[in-house]
Amino acid sequence: MIDGLPKHKIAVVKFDCLTSSDQEQYRNAGVTAVIGYAGKLCPDHFFVTNVQDAFDWAKGKGFDLLITESAGLCNRCSPHIQGIPAVCVIDNLSGINTPRKLGPVLRLADTVVVTKGDVVSQAEREIFAYNIRLVNPRANILQVNGITGQGAFLLAKNMEKTRSVDTLSGMQLRFTTPSSVCAYCTGERRIGMEYHLGMNKAMEFE
C-alpha cells in the first residue's frame, strides 16, 4: 500500500499490547514507525490517551500522512475517530461467521480490508463478504493479498481521500470504550465476590 502513495511522507504509529516486530518490518520498507505498548492497560484506552501526542509528533517531523494501528484484540472496542477514515482488517481464515461476532470495530469502519482470500474457496469468500455486509452495509470492502500486493493499490487510493486536519483535540471517537473499570483492571488477581469492586456485570443461571 505504501508504494501506492509515492507523493506522501508517511509515518506509522502502532499501538500494541506486549511485543511487536512491526517496527523492523516498517523500517525495512523505508517507513518511519513508532511502536507503543499498552502493557497492563486497555489497548484502546492507551490509544485514546496517546493519539494526540502521536499526531503532534508526526506533524512536527513534517509527515503529511499518519497511519495509526491498534492491536485490535477487543472486538467490543472501536478506537475509530469521527471524521478520520477508519479501516478494519479481517482475514478469511478467522471463520465465515466471524464478521457477525465483531462489534463497532467492524460495524463503524469506512473500509474493510479482507486478507488471505487466496487460501479459501470462492464460496467461502462470498459468504464471508456477505456477513460483513450484514454488519456494515455501507463499508467499502477490499480484498487484499499481503504477499502479492493485489488490492493494495486500491487501498492506497482510498487512503488518499482522507481530509487534512490540524489537530485531533476536541474530535470524538465513533463509539465509547469499555466502561467496566473493576478491581481486576487495576491489578487484583484473587477470585471471589469480596474482591469484585467497581463496575461488574453478573450472568444469570437457572
Residue ranges and their predicted role:
Residues 1-81, 95, 117, 150:
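Nucleotide-state-sensitive switch-loop elements of NTP-binding domains
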Residues 29-30, 82-83, 107-108, 135-137:
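Short, structured coil segments at secondary-structure junctions
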Residues 14, 36, 87-92, 113-116, ...:
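Conserved beta-strand segments of the P-loop GTPase G domain that flank and frequently precede/overlap
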Residues 19-23, 97-103, 124-131:
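Short, glycine/polar-rich helix-capping loops at beta-to-alpha or helix-loop-helix junctions
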Residues 47-53, 153-163, 183-188:
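Short, surface-exposed amphipathic charged segments that create phosphate/polyanion-binding patches used
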Residues 2-7, 166-206:
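P-loop NTP-binding site
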Residues 111, 118-174:
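Canonical P-loop GTPase G-domain recognition
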Residues 72-94, 100-110:
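Inter-motif core of Ras-like GTPase G domains
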